[in-house]
Amino acid sequence: MAEGVRRLLGKPGSVSLQPYIKLLKTIEEREEALRKLSDAELTEVATELGNAELPYDRDDLAELCALGREAARRTLGERPFDTQLIGMMALLDGHVAEMATGEGKTLTGALAAVGFALRGQRVHVLSVNDYLARRDAEWMRPLYTLLGVEVGWISQESTTEERRAAYAADITYASVSELGFDVLRDRLATDVSELVVPEPNVAIIDEADSVLVDEARVPLVLAGAAEPAESDAAMAELVRRLRPGIDYKVDDDGRNVHLTDTGINVVEKALGGVDLFSAEDTTLLSRVNLALHAHALLHRDVHYVVRDGKVRLINESRGRIALLQRWPDGLQAAVEAKEHLTPSETGEVLDSITVQSLVLRYPIRCGMTGTAMAVAEQLREFYELEVAVIAPNKPNIRIDEEDRLYATAEEKEEAVVEKVKEVHATGRPILIGTQDVAESERLAKRLRRAGLECVVLNAKNDAEEAAVIAEAGTYGRITVSTQMAGRGTDIRLGGSDMRDRDRVVKTGGLYVIGYGRYPSSRLDDQLRGRAGRQGDPGGSVFYVSVEDDLITTNLPEAKGYRVSSADGEITDPAWKEMVNHAQRIAEGQLLELHRNTWRYNQIIDVQRSVVLEQRRAVLHEDLGSRQLAVDCPETYQRLVEEVGEEEVARAARLVTLYHLDRGWADHNAFLADLREGIHLRFLGRRDPLDEFNRDAVPAFKGFLDEARARAAEMFEKLEVVDGRLDVAAAGVKRPSTTWTYMVQDQPFSTDLENIVGRVKNLMGRD
């Protein structure tokens, strides 16, 4: 009934699984026949299945499922459940399969990858990190080998040749960031032989909600001409002396900070009587604002950690160190100055691509996750993906208790410690999920003071996270973890070897405690899903306080609660619903931010595609030579006579590509500046997006003609040196080094909030 109503309303729901379920009996019959075949004969069956194109008809699909099941049994010692085969078929139909934790998503994805690969599709299995990419590729390798398909994987340490070899395989496992960086590097290639990433066919995305929603806006960046950034230690020291609440104020939602009139006077006096709002030097106000944001809004062990003398950002959706992420250069340098660190390198952005744009390159997209329905609307809106909700192989018997709500953070912490004492006394393993690093360490200290020894898994020791989380089901173990660190690793009752499984089962299984609700219900569900794996017993409960960021940020006016007991607990159902309401507000804000970023990126992606198509023609079709032969006929002919057609073609290619790349880098910088300042026009009651498009479109008009004209101008200046055309002397200068990173987009507020806040300050001055 509910599903039918959703369809009538046009809202995303689960796709019908009936076509897949109807095949299960046929699959089982085929499986019996395949069991009699030798390995070589099984490989031959796989080869024969590949003698056709997608999609699979019902007969071939049943054969493929039976083949995958038998191959997995022989090579991995695992016979896929019916639910895994249903998930496999959903992936082959281009859906996102929602499968609970522990239901075998890795094998499901591998079986689907085989199905695509046998039909001639190049498959990229995208993971959230290098560890999982390598682990899953090696784990599934025997299965792939038996079925006659090759598998490869790449990591941050992979050489160019190793990457090329991995991408040449039928199936390639890679983290989203590494794939994106390879795509960006290919966009600077000056010869076909330098290209690494083949044309995209199929993307199977693991942890699809994390990649496609949480990180969709994250730009992957390729920079060149790196040089040390300027340290602003003096400005950091100045804002360090400012008084909170007097010289500056932080907004109630904690997303913006601004100087008060008193603070403006203090800063201007400290800087020698300058006018912060002088039109002659706009950089001074920017420097002050950056230093103030770094000081007041970005907190060590919450938003970042300092490791090996460097600022390392914490990925908010995963609770892990994000080694490849950084803030935009000015803010990055401000945080480094705040921490008295040497400023890291900065450089010119040559190109960038968001995770969303990276995934949309693939004609066929599908994925797996434990929490897809909660973001079904985004998956449909941004990726044209539908969700297939697949029931667990065994019924879920986990007991999810009602939230426990407290008046203060201190009372919540005390209640959690008491609960841990009570549960730990039974030997039941406990997993506590916290919001950030500082919180995990503070709670761990409190537990230890109470005589409760615990293992802390947070962004500071992420290298061992898989091994640590694998033991969280050990009898008597207490594990404190930031958000979803260790995601992708199963927690087995009794420890990784399951030695004490029966004893842990008798205690009630893993007990999960959420130390505060997350900004997204999906993150809550992911934490809960750690318990009750594959029909195991388990339990979960969330402890929340009115002082939690989720409440104070999204419902700052919430007051008037009544404490129900001496320990500060609030049992009023209306107040518990307020927590859900605050979470819905947070989710709505994130969705609108995603939509807003997508709208701005649409025009940029269209313009980028024009440049990339031109670049492809220059690399593969000698477009540069043909254009310059027309634009500079006399010079072209003279040079051909001097050095030959091949050398002239090489020089023409390098010159043409240089001006395409140079022009795009300049245009990209223009778009970034335009995007940064566009919200000022909101104050004039004009729509910022319309204004952005109104400026971005004409700025790109004539781009290709301009690049072609500049290439012709440079081509005329080419000289022959030792039998070759010296393009460097003519001005072709490629960056000596390039580097890649991910930008932490909008860490504390939108551009509009920041700029309007500054303008309010300006308008408030006499």
Swiss-Prot record:
One of its GO terms (cellular component) is plasma membrane. InterPro entries: Helicase_ATP-bd, Helicase_C-like, P-loop_NTPase, SecA, SecA_Actinobact-type, SecA_CS, SecA_DEAD, SecA_motor_DEAD. Keywords: ATP-binding, Cell membrane, Cytoplasm, Membrane, Nucleotide-binding, Protein transport, Translocase, Translocation, Transport. The keyword RNA-binding does not apply. GO terms for biological process: intracellular protein transmembrane transport; protein import; protein targeting; protein transport by the Sec complex. One of its GO terms (molecular function) is ATP binding. It is a peripheral membrane protein. Disulfide bonds: none annotated. It is an enzyme of class 7 (translocase). Its main location: membrane. The keyword Nucleotide-binding applies. Pfam families: P-loop_SecA, SecA_DEAD, SecA_PP_bind, SecA_SW. It comes from the Bacteria. Signal peptide: none annotated. Its EC number is 7.4.2.8. It is found in: Cell membrane; Cytoplasm. Belongs to the SecA family. Part of the Sec protein translocase complex. Interacts with the SecYEG preprotein conducting channel. Has a central role in coupling the hydrolysis of ATP to the transfer of proteins into and across the cell membrane, serving as an ATP-driven molecular motor driving the stepwise translocation of polypeptide chains across the membrane. Monomer and homodimer. Part of the essential Sec protein translocation apparatus which comprises SecA, SecYEG and auxiliary proteins SecDF. Other proteins may also be involved. This is Protein translocase subunit SecA 2. The gene is secA2.
